[in-house]
Amino acid sequence: MRTTRRGFTLIELLIVVVIIGILAAIAIPKFANTKSKAYIAAMKSDLRNLVTAEESFFSDSAVYATDTLKGMKFKPSTGVAMPTISTFSGAWLATNTHSQLANFSCGIGVNTTNPLVTTAGDGEPVCK
């Protein structure tokens, strides 16, 4: 009499491996740019924090600071460069970059147009 074996055949195992490979091929590109999204979020967050620091400094001294270390004691996130700040009469703008994102920067303008995207709203950080 013939006994039945319990377990999977080689074909069944190969089909499972192929299906897992297809699912991985679909999922990996969706998560590939997760790091760059995190870097952009850090740059935007730093610009929002800079708005708070600048306006706080302005309320104390009636001028906007251009030196983030001395005047405001502002420290950017890891990998984010110290923002470049330009001040005007009652307005200022700033841009920053990240060490892991080449040819990419974020900017913000307060009481003036955004230095990167002129259609951005007042105080809205935009990356390009």
Locate each region found by the language model.
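Periplasmic/extracellular, small/polar-rich flexible segments of pilin-like filament-forming proteins
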Residues: 48, 52-128
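Compositionally biased non-globular segments, especially hydrophobic aliphatic-rich helices
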Residues: 12, 41-44, 121-123
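Conserved catalytic core of two-component sensor histidine kinases
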Residues: 17, 44, 51
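N-terminal single-pass transmembrane signal-anchor helix
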Residues: 2-31
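Short, contiguous, well-ordered secondary-structure segments
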Residues: 1-2, 56
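Aliphatic-rich helix starts adjacent to a transmembrane/signal segment
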Residues: 30-47
